[in-house]
Amino acid sequence: MKFIILILSICSVLVGQGTRYIDEVFEEVIKTEDVIYGNAPDLPFWFWVESNTVDIDLDMDIYEPADDTALVRPVIIFLHTGAFFSGHNELDDVVDLAISAAKRGYSAISMNYRLGLNVLSTYSAERAVFRAVQDGSAVIRYLREYSELYN
């Protein structure tokens, strides 16, 4: 009987703590801007040949809840829209999603990825997706390497 009361007491405490990650429990968010997570060859905006590249720094913005005592938080990575042709990580919808996730207790990442799509090329769309996946993998590698710095 004592064991059942102990289990029920623990469950009632856990149920009361369950709103983190669901409801916005933090008022303020800390934003770390323009964190460089890599460097890669990029295509100019208007291109006809995919061998014409320029190296660029790849950056992201990190949103974290202010005054959070958790040492480890789950991470959500947001990518902007734009069909691999346009966009950046400071578009209003991506920023709003990242702030909302950080207020719920997550670490939220809004990342830039390499753009470039030649509608006249049959392989350009596949290569654009491949570059974005590579950039997403680079963000994950960076976050794993510097996890102690960014929680």
Model-derived segments and spans:
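Bacterial Sec-dependent N-terminal signal peptides
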Residues: 1-20
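Short beta-strand element of the alpha/beta-hydrolase
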Residues: 71-83
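Alpha/beta-hydrolase active-site loop signature
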Residues: 83, 115-117
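Alpha/beta-hydrolase active-site loop
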Residues: 126-149
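Short amphipathic alpha-helix adjacent to the substrate-entry channel of hydrolases
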Residues: 90-110
